[in-house]
Amino acid sequence: MAQVQYYGTGRRKSSVARVRLVPGEGRIIVNGRDIRDYVPYESLVEVVKQPLVLTETFGSYDVLVNVSGGGFTGQAGAIRHGIARALLQVDPEYRQTLKRAGLLTRDSRVKERKKYGLKGARRAPQFSKR
């Protein structure tokens, strides 16, 4: 018999995470490696676990993730977004909890482009009065 799987896609900055939830014992596998081997900061591991802890499903599902683009923070945010979306397929009742915590909203903040004539996006060259 085929195993039940739930899918969700999460995005943050330039990262895209394709998430699969499979009934299991709570392992989080990112690009074939354990989350603790993949992400160098414990705080980012907590960010990834947030939707599972909020819905009290941590330990009930194995999370299998393919993530690409961006850095560690963007990837952790994308994984969190993907897990939250996949949990909606598990039980639509989770929507209110996840929405209240802001986990279903795509964080649209991205780096602002550098403009010509400036040193950065907004930083102007030093001004000399005389």
UniProtKB/Swiss-Prot annotation:
The lineage of its organism: Bacteria, Bacillati, Bacillota, Bacilli, Bacillales. Transmembrane segments: none annotated. Belongs to the universal ribosomal protein uS9 family. It comes from Anoxybacillus flavithermus (strain DSM 21510 / WK1). It comes from the Bacteria. GO terms for cellular component: cytosolic small ribosomal subunit. PROSITE patterns: RIBOSOMAL_S9 (PS00360). This is Small ribosomal subunit protein uS9. One of its GO terms (molecular function) is structural constituent of ribosome. Disulfide bonds: none annotated. One of its GO terms (biological process) is translation. The keyword rRNA-binding does not apply.
